[in-house]
Amino acid sequence: MENLKKMAGITAAEFIKDGMVVGLGTGSTAYYFVEEIGRRIKEEGLQITAVTTSSVTSKQAEGLNIPLKSIDQVDFVDVTVDGADEVDSQFNGIKGGGGALLMEKVVATPSKEYIWVVDESKLVEKLGAFKLPVEVVQYGAEQVFRHFERAGYKPSFREKDGQRFVTDMQNFIIDLALDVIENPIAFGQELDHVVGVVEHGLFNQMVDKVIVAGRDGVQISTSKKGK
């Protein structure tokens, strides 16, 4: 599995050219993309500026001497490469297993090209087997939790080391055990209207390319948005 993730990450790095502003994703597959960018800077003299999607990725990038700016210091991002927890046949996805979904979406939105790197196990016909992360402000988080309980969404507060997990933006995450999401676009819109919800892990019709590493090698699929 790690080899597949590495293959996908290295393939994605081939899309990066001198002079680009590059969004560096977060997670186990995006990790290999960031490592390959660091190698290319060191060995090939690749010249880029990067923005990151989490404190974890920032630390990794700094260790590789990748030049960084904040998202507010750039007008746009040429290419962002990130992982995904599930990807359906309509190029909708669930992200946020690593807890960085808000920053990931903030960086993805001004990106001219948005690429996901995944192994083939992440491809699904319908989203929902992976718990859907919802980032909520700490104030009133219990109210949001009870709202999700009443709706039958089987919520749980994400925890780390016995405490509630706190994101880089100092919010909580409520994971929803939905089993299947029949209409991701409509459900995303529903979540957008829940007071106290900052962002959710549905990335609907945002991605341009999906790089999938499997037993038969690497395949690149392009969405309607990316064509």
From Swiss-Prot:
Query: Where is substrate bound in this sequence?
Result: 26-29, 82-85, 95-98, 122
Reactions the enzyme catalyzes: aldehydo-D-ribose 5-phosphate = D-ribulose 5-phosphate
> What's the name of the protein?
Ribose-5-phosphate isomerase A
Name of encoding gene: rpiA
* CDD domains with a match to the protein in the record: RPI_A (cd01398)
Give the metabolic or biological pathway.
Carbohydrate degradation; pentose phosphate pathway; D-ribose 5-phosphate from D-ribulose 5-phosphate (non-oxidative stage): step 1/1
Q: Identify the EC number(s).
A: 5.3.1.6
Q: Which UniProt keywords apply?
A: Isomerase
Q: What does this protein do?
A: Catalyzes the reversible conversion of ribose-5-phosphate to ribulose 5-phosphate.
